[in-house]
Amino acid sequence: MKVLVVNGPNLNMLGKRDKNIYGNFSHEDLVKMIEDWGRKNGVEVEVFQSNHEGKILDRLHRLDFDGLVINPGAFTHYSYAIRDALEIVKVPKVEVHISNIHRREEFRRRSVTAEVCDGQISGLGVYGYLLALEYIKKKLEELT
């Protein structure tokens, strides 16, 4: 069982961004937390981060994973290319946001990518990733 975790633009800057919105975790801390979860749960996890839409598309197009957690960052609000790629990916998938996008600026409240995911977790900090991973693990176990 392999789960891909994709982080979009500016998520590499966690720990340097507004701590009231994004918390104190660095991207390195987030990767370690996800990898630790994978080891404890017997799940292979790969964390991929890019600030470039095309690189995210190329990674998704490899289709070499059984489940997907994606935080598209700002691409959430306007990337129909990522939306279309997510539609191609026929695995359990969850969109995650560290901040509650529904309590932020108006332009951040619309997700064009969530509607092609199984669900969206928003506003629970980095722990939203763990909830998404738990869901995907359970869903994959049900399918086997």
From Swiss-Prot:
<feature type="binding site">
    <location>
        <position position="71"/>
    </location>
    <ligand>
        <name>substrate</name>
    </ligand>
</feature>
<dbReference type="InterPro" id="IPR018509">
    <property type="entry name" value="DHquinase_II_CS"/>
</dbReference>
<feature type="site" description="Transition state stabilizer">
    <location>
        <position position="17"/>
    </location>
</feature>
<comment type="subunit">
    <text>Homododecamer.</text>
</comment>
<feature type="binding site">
    <location>
        <position position="77"/>
    </location>
    <ligand>
        <name>substrate</name>
    </ligand>
</feature>
<dbReference type="GO" id="GO:0009423">
    <property type="term" value="P:chorismate biosynthetic process"/>
</dbReference>
<keyword id="KW-0456">Lyase</keyword>
<keyword id="KW-0057">Aromatic amino acid biosynthesis</keyword>
<dbReference type="InterPro" id="IPR036441">
    <property type="entry name" value="DHquinase_II_sf"/>
</dbReference>
<dbReference type="GO" id="GO:0019631">
    <property type="term" value="P:quinate catabolic process"/>
</dbReference>
<feature type="binding site">
    <location>
        <position position="84"/>
    </location>
    <ligand>
        <name>substrate</name>
    </ligand>
</feature>
<dbReference type="GO" id="GO:0009073">
    <property type="term" value="P:aromatic amino acid family biosynthetic process"/>
</dbReference>
<comment type="function">
    <text>Catalyzes a trans-dehydration via an enolate intermediate.</text>
</comment>
<comment type="pathway">
    <text>Metabolic intermediate biosynthesis; chorismate biosynthesis; chorismate from D-erythrose 4-phosphate and phosphoenolpyruvate: step 3/7.</text>
</comment>
<dbReference type="GO" id="GO:0008652">
    <property type="term" value="P:amino acid biosynthetic process"/>
</dbReference>
<dbReference type="InterPro" id="IPR001874">
    <property type="entry name" value="DHquinase_II"/>
</dbReference>
<feature type="binding site">
    <location>
        <position position="108"/>
    </location>
    <ligand>
        <name>substrate</name>
    </ligand>
</feature>
<feature type="active site" description="Proton donor">
    <location>
        <position position="97"/>
    </location>
</feature>
<protein>
    <recommendedName>
        <fullName>3-dehydroquinate dehydratase</fullName>
        <ecNumber>4.2.1.10</ecNumber>
    </recommendedName>
</protein>
<feature type="binding site">
    <location>
        <begin position="98"/>
        <end position="99"/>
    </location>
    <ligand>
        <name>substrate</name>
    </ligand>
</feature>
<comment type="similarity">
    <text>Belongs to the type-II 3-dehydroquinase family.</text>
</comment>
<keyword id="KW-0028">Amino-acid biosynthesis</keyword>
<feature type="active site" description="Proton acceptor">
    <location>
        <position position="22"/>
    </location>
</feature>
<dbReference type="Pfam" id="PF01220">
    <property type="entry name" value="DHquinase_II"/>
</dbReference>
<dbReference type="GO" id="GO:0003855">
    <property type="term" value="F:3-dehydroquinate dehydratase activity"/>
</dbReference>
